[in-house]
Amino acid sequence: MQQQGEPSVLSLRPGGGGGKSRLFVPRFSSSSSFDLTNGGSEETPFPVKRENSGERVRFSREEILQHRESVQVSDEILRRCKEIAVELFGEEQSWGNHAAESKITNHTQHRHTETDNRDWHSRSQIPTSGKEWLRDDPREAKSTWQGSGPTPVLIKAEVPWSAKRGALSDKDRVVKSVKGILNKLTPEKYELLKGQLIDAGITSADILKEVIQLIFENAILQPTFCEMYALLCFDINGQLPSFPSEEPGGKEITFKRVLLNNCQEAFEGAGKLKEEIRQMTNPDQEMERMDKEKMAKLRTLGNIRLIGELLKQKMVPEKIVHHIVQELLGDDTKACPAEGDVEALCQFFITIGKQLDDSPRSRGINDTYFGRLKELARHPQLELRLRFMVQNVVDLRANKWVPRREEVKAKKINEIHSEAERNLGMRPGAMASMRNNNNNRAAVSGAADGMGLGNILGRPGTGGMMPGMPGTRVMPMDEDGWEMARTRSMPRGNRQTVQQPRFQPPPAINKSLSVNSRLLPQGSGGLLNGGGRPSPLLQGNGSSSAPQASKPIPTVEKPQPRSQPQPQPQAAPLANSLNAGELERKTKSLLEEYFSIRLVDEALQCVEELKSPSYHPELVKETISLGLEKNPPLVEPIAKLLKHLISKNVLTSKDLGAGCLLYGSMLDDIGIDLPKAPNSFGEFLGELVSAKVLDFELVRDVLKKMEDEWFRKTVLNAVIKSVRECPSGQSVLDSQAVEVEACQSLL
């Protein structure tokens, strides 16, 4: 029971208020008056016992609805409820109205489907009494804000930003274009972007100076690319126009003169910048001083290297080089130069030392310079790090300017691949094959999975790319040319290459199984042998297997009679087949490399190294096949390569025609997997016919090799269309009208 003197406070939370650990709520009576705002009466309808003050007590809906009959609601609450009901349902409601209760129950279901046509802006304000309304209503706040007045007008800025405001001047347009070109400049894109830079629109001296400043800043801040930027300066020096001097009687403004002036100003301004850095002694300027020191060092070394690379391109005279060296060494032969000057001097000699030694006029002066460098290498006041740096330059000259480590410079992608192949011991062109032949490796992996081998055959190293990998084992061969596991009675030879394979294949491998040996990696036969049984899957695929074939090991399973002669293996056909396999592998490697770098001269050199004229028709067929498999088909690169090989007398027209016939005979099968192959093949033939390398007589022979009528029509239409697009195409069609009609008669 409640104690006397304690006022009863009603809380809307279940269990009432009071905050006591044990609270008994008296029952409501019908005669008691109840006012939510004044605290209500002393009786409540539900006695609830709360043992824990933090516990939340919940009532059911039926219990809460009992309040309606037992509570006397104040007039203020009834008025508020009516106003809310009018807002929600459009008519007056009461607590005792059961229709309103039904509307409240179904309001959630219909509120999204009903159309609200009421005027919310013109509704009357809710009158307030002396007692404040404690509930915050967001709808009320929103309507109050909306009815406060018109929306304030946005104030526009005097000079608003606009992406299209104003047109760029010619100077700004050219500078912006040159910035984009220099940001994309790489050794691979050099030729293309160089032409764009020349055609950028340099039509005045001011534009020329801005462009040179951009090139100069990019070069000195990227010392690794100084060689490329120096070559760019040399190439565009004669292509850009010169302009008259702004001063009367002055020299004309040329690219070379402005560039050398920039180099001179940067070299002479380094001293002023160092003096400014020395004056920054305030502790608060420590970070700024360190940043400026790094930037000054980077700009000095970059400028020195750029001047050296310009000397190699004959754009800087040697007298300027000697002046720079003498400035860096200083006039006092006994004094120690500054650390930054010594480091710049070493970088300068690494760049141009060989050129100075090769010049008869500069060789003697160079001896004097290096005599001074030898003294600096032993100078006690010089930092030990710089003494080692100077000694490395002296040793470099003694070694005929051949560095112990390769100099870091910008390289092309194919150069990086070649270097990786040399370092990893991979065959030439393996990197291009690994990058472009993902489909072939996936096929090999799938074949291996089907045999239960997992992905062991799909590894890049297993295919004989790297020497010493498991796929390069040399296994002995029996008289039939089958590989056998080595036994103790057999000579071991190289212990590293004939060790027993650790992998034991499943029993299904030793059963009758048909596997295409072209899909398996080179030298994979050693992985498939196990248990001393011969492997019927594939033979050795390397040049080292040929001597094994000439010395057969007699089988011991079934001895033969003495009267019957022992069959001797035919070594020559085996050698020829291995030679053909090796040629096919090298051909695919050189073609993949050509398709990635598009250098016909390198491809020409690789074809010449094959030294197999009889294989040239097959080479033409492989070129067409690999090129048309690409996406998109490489029609133009294929035609360009083959025309170049014919012009250099590496291929003959007969070889080219035979290769086209070989591919044409395969087109019925290829066209099923590559629907675009017939049209691409026709475009390729049209390129050669337009160049008068082939004629329509060969096209007719190629069409005869095809059985599919639709493929014939597609190829011929593509040939005629490609020839017509050539400037002299109509004359070619007129001169070979008879052959064209013969081709059309096959359709």
From Swiss-Prot:
Amino-acid biosynthesis listed as a keyword: no
Domain MI: 582-704
InterPro entries cross-referenced by the UniProt entry: ARM-type_fold (IPR016024), Initiation_fac_eIF4g_MI (IPR003891), MIF4G-like_typ-3 (IPR003890)
Keywords in alphabetical order: Initiation factor, Protein biosynthesis, Translation regulation
GO biological process: regulation of translation
SMART domains referenced in this protein's UniProt entry, alphabetically: MA3 (SM00544), MIF4G (SM00543)
UniProt feature, compositional bias: Basic and acidic residues: 111-122, 132-142
Domain MIF4G per the UniProt entry, residue ranges: 176-400
Annotated spans, Disordered: 1-54, 105-149, 489-580
Keyword presence, Protein biosynthesis: yes
GO MF terms held by the record: RNA binding; translation initiation factor activity
Phenotype of null mutants: Displays no resistance to potyvirus. Possesses reduced amounts of chlorophyll a and b. I4g1 and i4g2 double mutants show reduced germination rates, slow growth rates, moderate chlorosis, late flowering, impaired fertility and reduced long term seed viability. They also exhibit altered responses to dehydration, salinity, and heat stress. The i4g1 and i4g2 double mutant has reduced amounts of chlorophyll a and b.
Assembly and interaction partners: EIF4F is a multi-subunit complex, the composition of which varies with external and internal environmental conditions. It is composed of at least EIF4A, EIF4E and EIF4G. In higher plants two isoforms of EIF4F have been identified, named isoform EIF4F and isoform EIF(iso)4F. Isoform EIF4F has subunits p220 and p26, whereas isoform EIF(iso)4F has subunits p82 and p28.
Role: Plays a role in the accumulation of some potyvirus during viral infection.
Protein name per UniProt: Eukaryotic translation initiation factor isoform 4G-2
Lineage: Eukaryota, Viridiplantae, Streptophyta, Embryophyta, Tracheophyta
